[in-house]
Curated annotation (Swiss-Prot):
Residues 1-159 form the Obg domain. An essential GTPase which binds GTP, GDP and possibly (p)ppGpp with moderate affinity, with high nucleotide exchange rates and a fairly low GTP hydrolysis rate. Plays a role in control of the cell cycle, stress response, ribosome biogenesis and in those bacteria that undergo differentiation, in morphogenesis control. It comes from the Bacteria. This is GTPase Obg. Its EC number is 3.6.5.-. Residues 160-333 form the OBG-type G domain.
């Protein structure tokens, strides 16, 4: 199935049903008082994370989703039915963004997580709501409010513990194949990897971590060269980045310069991503002697001023990979995801009609604590005000 990590859809919550103006009319009860019911609320639109999905391709073809409208109120104090909600299933790791305001509505980082993205319109109030000691026969109602409408940008960001960085043909896909059961395409030409992929690296029966491989970066990627830098977003949730470097490039380029290119593109994309823990791993040491590999790695790190540890591996032969995998696992266990990052709630999103009813009732001086008896005297019309509203 084609991997799609971005989609723009139109979502429309249901409109609220209108309130009803009605009066109780029964034999021997000539003035039974108001009995108009409220309308029903409009249906909401939700997103729910589904671990069985791994692409947003479904939303490339069907782009408009609308919830049901609330039913109008009826006489005999009958409230209209609420509109049915709709729930859209998306992959775990999806972020919802309002395309007009660029407001992040929320992230779905756990299977089964549910997110309200468009709130249905509020129901209108029937004339029963406006009865009071001074208004015995109100002819007033409110209309249901329109449901929220949004152009929603969906962005899928893969959930992985380790992210792979490097130029094209640095050996990232070969590394994924070496440490996991994933089988990304491997070939001797640039940009063999066109879409991100995941692999599960298992250290032993009870310990494993997830590795994310993305297409390689080249100089000018931030300006659109190659496949650009848009796939870097898939590394934002990783705990550590593995910068894989070809220690003996076939084009005879300088590995130190290649490292500088990746770091520059990383900083241009996001300083937050650039500040993540980053490990330097020299690959393809099987193409040169061990002594030459050690000498080159030392020279490169000295020129870069790299003071951290680094690794020398061969993804093709598996040399030194078991030790690297164990060290990564130890780092992940020693640095669990921060609680605030794992359970971080999105900033409260203000929906359009949150305060609508309070405003409507306060404008009309309605006190919901007032009680009124239906058996009022026919002659007692003091203070009765008839309000006509279309």
């Amino acid at each position: 199935m084609k991997f799609i990590d971005e989609a723009l859809i139109r979502i429309e919550a249901g409109d609220g049903g209108n309130g009803c103006v009605s009066f109780r009319r029964e034999k021997y009860i000539p003035k039974g008082g108001p009995d108009g019911g409220d309308g029903g609320d409009g249906g909401d639109v939700y997103l729910i994370a589904d671990e069985n999905l791994n692409t947003l391709i479904d939303y490339r073809f069907e782009k408009r989703f609308a919830a049901e409208r609330g039913e109008n109120g009826r006489s005999s104090n009958c409230t209209g039915h609420r509109g049915k909600d709709i729930t859209l299933r998306v992959p775990v790791g999806t972020r919802a963004i309002d395309n007009d305001t660029k407001e992040i509505i929320g992230d779905l980082t756990k299977n089964g997580a549910k997110l309200l993205v468009a709130k249905g319109g509020y129901h209108g109030l029937g004339n029963t709501r406006f009865k009071s000691s001074v208004n015995r026969a109100p002819r007033q109602k409110t209309m249901g409010t329109p449901g929220e409408k949004r152009d929603l940008q969906l962005e899928l960001m893969l959930l992985a513990d380790v992210g792979m960085l490097g130029l094209p043909n640095a050996g990232k896909s070969t590394f994924i194949r070496a440490v996991s059961a994933a089988k990304p395409k491997v070939a001797d030409y640039p940009f063999t990897t066109l879409v991100p992929s995941l692999g599960v690296a298992r250290v032993d029966a009870n310990r494993s971590f997830v590795v994310a491989d993305i297409p390689g970066l080249i100089e000018g990627a931030s300006e659109g060269a190659g496949l650009g830098i848009r796939f870097l977003k898939h590394l934002e949730r990783c705990r550590v980045l593995i910068h894989l470097v070809d220690i003996a490039p076939i084009d005879e380029s300088d590995p130190a310069d290649n490292i500088g290119i990746i770091e520059s593109e990383l900083f241009q994309y996001s300083e937050k991503l650039a500040d993540k823990p980053r490990w330097l791993v020299f690959n393809k040491i099987d193409t040169i002697s061990d002594e030459e590999a050690a000498k080159r790695a030392k020279d490169i790190t000295e020129r870069l001023g790299w003071e951290e540890d680094y690794y020398l591996i061969s993804a093709a032969t598996g040399k030194n990979i078991p030790q690297l995998i164990r060290d990564i696992m130890d780092f992940i266990e020693a640095n669990p995801r921060e609680v605030e990052e794992e359970e971080k709630a999105a900033e409260e999103v203000k929906f359009k009609w949150d305060d609508y009813h309070n405003e409507q009732l306060s404008e009309r001086g309605f006190d919901d604590e007032e009680d009124w008896d239906d058996d009022w005297s026919e002659e007692d019309d003091e203070g009765v005000e008839f309000i006509y509203k279309p």
